[in-house]
């Protein structure tokens, strides 16, 4: 039997699983890591903790399953969305990652909306709002409040994309994470160059965007040693946790999901 590997880079920990082609769960391992709140409303993590947890959990999952590495045929990702991992010219992490639940960027989000000509203008660029959790506000915050770190930043990634980069050596994201920056034109499925230009960001720092089912690369020799996965294993882009969970629930076509609201509580 062949197996697929999955990695979810969560907020409280990373989970690594192996699933058989018949759908049975062959192994599951979780490793927790800390969250830091240096100021009220701030939420940060050390990306090195994600990687250490991923390597340990995946190696343990392979051992737990008893599966031969050669029978593992693919790997994909989900993970916490919107976090900012800033990388320098050597792809080293510049500062702790700013997470999805960080609330420091309220002023920056309003500034982005104003720069776009108001909410209607922003929707014309991206078909999306700009919320404090989104990555776009974090980029502007870094530019305004940590200009030295911003100047050092040559690339940025979101959390799961950073771990996939360490697995494959390729810097990329998927459409769901790109949308979660608030700077991505959802209809055109590309970053909005006009909006990014208005904000004074350099397009060169933005990652390549893939569809969730696109091949993102292959497990490198070094990553194989650290994780127990086979070298050369195909790695697919995956998506943000809030998106991938819908796929897991079978919400893959129009009419399978809706919403309701409570107008009055008795």
What residue ranges belong to the model's regions?
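Carbohydrate-associated surface elements
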Residues: 102
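Short acidic-glycine loop/turn motifs at beta-strand connectors
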Residues: 20-22, 88-90, 167-170, 253, ...
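Alpha-helix C-terminal capping segments
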Residues: 248-254
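Residue-level detector of conserved catalytic or cofactor/ligand-binding positions
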Residues: 257-266
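N-terminal glycine/serine-rich phosphate-binding loop of ATP-dependent small-molecule kinases
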Residues: 1-95, 107, 124, 152, ...
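Gly/Ser/Thr-rich active-site cleft segment
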Residues: 9-11, 22, 122-240
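Pocket-flanking alpha-helical
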Residues: 85, 107-111, 245-247
């Amino acid at each position: 039997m062949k197996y697929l590997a999955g990695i979810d880079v969560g907020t409280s920990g990373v989970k690594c699983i192996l699933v058989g082609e018949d759908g049975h769960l062959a192994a599951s391992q979780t490793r927790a890591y800390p969250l830091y709140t240096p100021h009220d409303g701030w939420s940060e993590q050390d990306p090195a903790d994600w990687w250490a947890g991923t390597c340990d959990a995946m190696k343990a999952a392979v051992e737990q399953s008893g599966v031969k590495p050669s029978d593992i045929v693919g790997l994909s990702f989900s993970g916490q969305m919107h976090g900012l991992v800033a990388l320098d010219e050597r792809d080293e992490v510049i500062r702790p990652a700013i997470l999805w639940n960080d609330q420091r960027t309220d002023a920056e989000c309003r500034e982005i909306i104003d720069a776009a000509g108001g909410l209607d203008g922003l929707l014309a660029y991206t078909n999306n709002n700009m919320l404090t959790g989104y990555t776009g506000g974090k980029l502007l915050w870094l530019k305004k409040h940590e200009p030295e770190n911003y100047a050092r930043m040559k690339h940025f990634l979101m959390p799961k994309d950073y771990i996939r980069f360490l697995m494959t050596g390729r810097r990329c994201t998927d459409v769901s994470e790109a949308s979660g920056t608030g700077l991505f034109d959802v209809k055109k499925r590309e970053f909005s160059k006009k909006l990014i230009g208005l904000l004074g960001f350099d397009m060169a720092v933005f990652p390549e965007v893939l569809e969730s089912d696109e091949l993102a690369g292959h497990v490198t020799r070094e990553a194989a040693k650290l994780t127990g996965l086979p070298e050369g294993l195909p790695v697919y882009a995956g998506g943000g946790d809030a998106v991938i969970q819908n796929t897991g629930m079978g919400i893959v076509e129009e009419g399978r999901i809706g919403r309701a609201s409570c107008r009055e509580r008795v």
